[in-house]
Swiss-Prot record:
Mg(2+) binds at residues 19, 57, 118. Catalyzes a mechanistically unusual reaction, the ATP-dependent insertion of CO2 between the N7 and N8 nitrogen atoms of 7,8-diaminopelargonic acid (DAPA, also called 7,8-diammoniononanoate) to form a ureido ring. This is ATP-dependent dethiobiotin synthetase BioD. The active site is at 40. Pathway: Cofactor biosynthesis; biotin biosynthesis; biotin from 7,8-diaminononanoate: step 1/2. HAMAP family: BioD (MF_00336). GO terms for cellular component: cytosol. The gene is bioD. Pfam families: AAA_26. It comes from the Bacteria. Its EC number is 6.3.3.3. CDD domains: DTBS. Its cofactor is Mg(2+). Homodimer.
């Protein structure tokens, strides 16, 4: 029996399409014949419906997954205010505990063939006074997929984030170019530069280029991602 796969999705910034790309990956894995589940372990920004607190990002992931996890497993830490998680957690009296998330991830792996873990904000967003999301990725011990919001400044953000991932001893399984600014000048040249540098310095391939979509259509975006190559990388990276 093949061991379950998993990956950690991070981004060059907040609001650059991590949830959108994570949903596209889930659709892609499902088309690849895999049972795909999502974890959004820390979500900041909740709304109440029918007496239940929910999160829009988590809702989008559930809609894309073909294995839907119980809310308390999918998102063990749901914070109400839409702000930096460590700030909101302190205000709401919540301790963002990595061990709890690792336990949820372990359970999720028993229910699916592949588990997509979406971070919050960028790679070094704090969780508390001493730990950040990079520490969570290390604790999970899974490869990372980097979502690059293609806009002015993205080259520097992408290379810095890739360096931070490597500094934690994690494998960068690949990156996705997500066009968030349709008016950006020289997008092709920017992507070509990132493709060359990330391949040379980190061996990280470009998994796909997603054009600006309004409204976002993760099911369509899934067809633009090299899921087969990513699955092979994830399998090779297994201990």
């Amino acid at each position: 029996m093949t061991a379950p796969l998993s990956l950690f999705v991070t981004g060059t910034d907040t609001e650059i399409g991590k949830t959108f790309v994570s949903a596209a990956l889930l659709h892609g894995f499902a088309r690849h014949g895999l049972r795909a589940a999502a974890l959004k372990p820390v979500a900041a920004g909740a709304y109440e419906r029918d007496g239940v607190w929910r999160n829009e990002d988590a809702d989008q992931l559930d809609a894309a997954a073909n294995v839907v996890l119980p809310p308390e497993l999918r998102t063990p830490f749901l914070l109400k205010a839409p702000a930096a998680p460590h700030i909101v957690a302190a205000q709401e009296g919540v301790t963002l505990d990595i061990d709890t998330i690792v336990a949820c991830h372990r359970e999720a792996l028993t229910r699916a063939d592949v588990v997509v873990v979406e971070g919050a904000g960028g790679f070094r967003v704090p969780m508390n006074d001493t730990q950040d999301l990079a520490d969570l990725a290390v604790a999970l011990g899974v490869p990372v997929v980097l979502v690059v919001g293609v806009r002015l400044g993205c080259i520097n953000h992408a290379l810095l984030t890739a360096d931070a991932i490597a500094a934690r001893g994690l494998k960068l399984a690949g990156w996705v170019a997500n066009h968030v600014d349709p008016a950006m000048s020289f997008p092709d040249e920017n992507i070509a530069t990132m493709r060359d540098w990330l391949a040379r310095e980190h061996g990280a391939p470009l998994l796909g280029r997603i054009p600006h979509m309004s409204p976002a259509a993760p099911e369509s975006a899934a067809a633009m991602l090299d899921i087969a190559a990513l699955v092979e990388t994830l399998r090779t990276a297994q201990p």
